[in-house]
């Protein structure tokens, strides 16, 4: 088995800067919005409706008239922190499935790398790709738990992913890459490449 062609190690760090900025914004949005809604408030009314009257909400056209559990689910999914984290999860998925066509990779290759000196050494692309998968797992768990109504699940998940992305961007410490190497040494992931 031959090792795949190496990548410029500055590329994943560049992508980690952008990802950490997005994750920081998602974390702040999640903290500002608070925990996920568990009830629907229709605001203040000038009259008291009859006890047996049924009120159908008109707050959002796509929510009105739906079952209560679906209304709550749609309200949770419409929060800005959820939407941004969902976009970040899609970017992580893109990085796992096709790292060469991921937007941050294209941006680095077309705008940044031509202005830099060639790298001294190339890096195995498998650990950074695995790290993208770990990031995808963490934010996906946060998204699912948020939809299920677990308080603070989304900002905690985005904060964890932010810490990992920031460590990679600022210090070159890729936690997902370290996990990949640990699992590789344990024989769980592939085989360690043999040195000639």
Residues of each region from the PLM?
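Membrane-interfacial helix-loop segments of redox and metal-homeostasis proteins
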Residues: 1-196
